[in-house]
Curated annotation (Swiss-Prot):
Encoding gene, per UniProt annotation: NDUFC2
PANTHER family per record: NADH DEHYDROGENASE [UBIQUINONE] 1 SUBUNIT C2-RELATED, NADH-UBIQUINONE OXIDOREDUCTASE SUBUNIT B14.5B
Organism from which the protein derives: Pan troglodytes
Subcellular location: Mitochondrion inner membrane
Protein origin, superkingdom: Eukaryota
Protein name: NADH dehydrogenase [ubiquinone] 1 subunit C2
Subunit structure: Complex I is composed of 45 different subunits. Interacts with TMEM242.
Gene Ontology biological-process entries: mitochondrial electron transport, NADH to ubiquinone
Length: 119
């Protein structure tokens, strides 16, 4: 894969990313990362030999919140990187239309074989 031209060093989320819509709070990726935070709280209890599910509920809630917050920005960065890649790809396709010819659209009748019921 070709590296981006003029990448901004040490920038997690450039100002250009503000134009993208924010990820929804019910995004499955965010919920999964929040669940990983809950699991890390359980593992912390297990390592410290506390009751796994009941000890330190406030700590588990803190892990969930911290992981969800970090995951929000990771998902936002991922969406930004995909948007940059798509913009570059579509720009290339616009500049080189001879490499991407339009294909004729086929109907379902042309794709599927004739149906002959066997009795």
């Amino acid at each position: 894969m070709i590296a981006r031209r003029n990448p901004e060093p040490l920038r997690f989320l450039p100002d250009e990313a503000r134009s993208l819509p924010p990820p929804k709070l019910t995004d499955p990726r965010l919920l999964y990362i929040g669940f990983l935070g809950y699991c890390s709280g359980l593992i912390d209890n297990l390592i410290r030999r506390r009751p796994v599910a009941t000890a330190g509920l406030h700590r588990q809630l803190l892990y969930i919140t911290a992981f969800f917050f970090a995951g929000y920005y990771l998902v936002k960065r991922e969406d930004y990187l995909y948007a940059v890649r798509d913009r570059e790809m579509f720009g290339y396709m616009k500049l080189h239309p001879e490499d991407f010819p339009e294909e004729d659209k086929k109907t379902y009748g042309e794709i599927f074989e004739k149906f002959h019921p066997i009795r």
